[in-house]
Each structure stands twice: as C-alpha cells, then as structure tokens.
C-alpha cells in the first residue's frame, strides 16, 4: 500500500531496488480475461514494471528484475493479497516461478527493546525466547489504568503495572506501514539481513487451488471446502 510503499521507497537501495505499491486488493482474476486484467491499473503497472509483457507476447528474457518480492502485512488481509498475487503469477507468469524469481518477504512480527538493545522476532516463539513469556505488549501497557494510591496487597491493576519499571518493551507490528524507513530496511529490505522465502510451483499450485475453490463458480465444492477447513481458519473480527 501507499504507507508501506512510501517507507519502502525512502528505505531502498536506489541502485538495485524498486518498490511498486499496490493499493488495496488486486483484481479477482478468477473470471477476468486478459483485456479486463490489463484495464486494472495495478496489474497494468505490475506488467510494465516486470517488462515481460503478458499472454502470447510474454518474453522472460525481457524481465527487468531477478528478485520479485511480495511484501504484505502479516494478517488475514495480507495473506489474501499474497494469495491473489501468487495466483496471478502462477496463471500468467509461471516461468517466473519456475525460474526462481518470485519470493515472499518475511517481516518481523515484534520489535523488542531490552535496555539499549533492539531485537526483532519473527514468531511468537521467538518473542517468548527473547523477551520471556510474561513480557507485556506495548498495547497492553498503554491500556493499563494508573497505579492506584494506597498500600497493602497490590490489586491486579497494580500488579500489571510492574512491567513499566522494567526496561523492556515489546511492540507488535500489525502491518508494514507501522515501520519507519530505517526499521523496514533493517528487517525486510537489507539483502544482508532480510529473510526471504522462495516461491515454488507447489506453493503457487496450492494458492491457485485455494483461490479457485473460494473464488470460483462451484458453490457446493466451496461450501464443502469451507466446512472441512473451518477449524483451521484464522479470522480478523
């Protein structure tokens, strides 16, 4: 999006990196013809940026970048956009996947400050390992009531405020746009430190299968798929 895209443009190495912000969810390509797809500003911009053209005139030798990195938020919306993009690449740019040119960025989920040290955690398990199981998130600290006056046995609110006296803070990143350019570079864009996952044909086939099941016209199959996987779903409500 524009927020993370703006930070990314400020953070990038201009000699080797280009950033293409995608606003919102891209077009549902399940039923879209090539001409309708190219009427979408986002897909048209992506095709131009890649340089390969699309459809019958696709030419991988004209590919302008050898690492195409999908960077989305670590939430349900981000996963949806990532699935849309993987499906687009699988159906219309498959040689890019076969050639090992498509990657998924792995931004951190948490920023942990311990005194003057800064650590980044990419999972809940890593957060617990660095900060400890009981370390409160900043959002939890901000929502706490002020310490009540008086003496005696601490109340639950007082007990929760003990964390304020410890030089430890844990911030959860809900999206790439929450990072400033320096953080985005350090964690997600610096070739020396970033973590990338190479997209394989199997990954793209899985994304395409799920996309086809959920966005296609076979309603009974979609209902059956949703019912069988309902317990595995992660929902933002």
Q: Where are the regions a protein language model picked out?
A:
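Conserved phosphate-chemistry cores used by DNA topoisomerases
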Residues: 2-237
